[in-house]
Amino acid sequence: MPMTTANLNMATAGSSAPLLHEILTKVNNAKDKPAKIAVLKKNDSVPLRQVLKGAFDPNIKWDLPEGTPPYKENDAPAGTEHTTLFQEARRLWHFVEGADQKLSKTKKEMMFIQLLEGLHKDDAALMVAVKDKALNKKYKGLTDAVVKEAFGWNSDYKTS
C-alpha cells in the first residue's frame, strides 16, 4: 500500500491516532496471516515502519543493554500526558549502534529511560521488546515474514 498523506501524518493526529501497542495488539488478535497483514497496511505510517524495522532488521543493533531498564512506568490514562511513538520514532536513531557517536553510552541509556517514562506503559514495554529484538514474542503472529509482506520489504528491509 502506498503511503498516503493521511497515514504519513499520524504523528500529528494527536490522541485520535491509535498507540502503537494498540495496532500491534490488533495484529496479535487477527486470525490469520492475511488479516495480520491487512491490519499493518491499514495502519501504515513512517513511525510504525521505523519501529518494526528496528525490531526485525538484523542489521540494526541497539546500543543499549539487553533487558528492561530501571524506569518509572507512566500510569496516566491513555491519551493524556503521554508522548507517543508516533512523535518519538524520529529520535530512535540515537539508540542504534554507530549512529550517534557524539553521545556517550550512559547518555543514550538515560535518554532511553526518559523516552520510556514519557510513553504509555504498554508502548514503553513494546519499545523494550523492540530493543531486545523480542517483539514477536510479545505479539503472536507478528513475524519477520508478515512485516516484510505488509510493507513490500525485501530481505534488506527495503522496498523492492
Give the residues covered by each predicted segment.
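N-terminal nucleic-acid-engaging modules of covalent nucleotidyltransferase systems
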Residues: 1-160
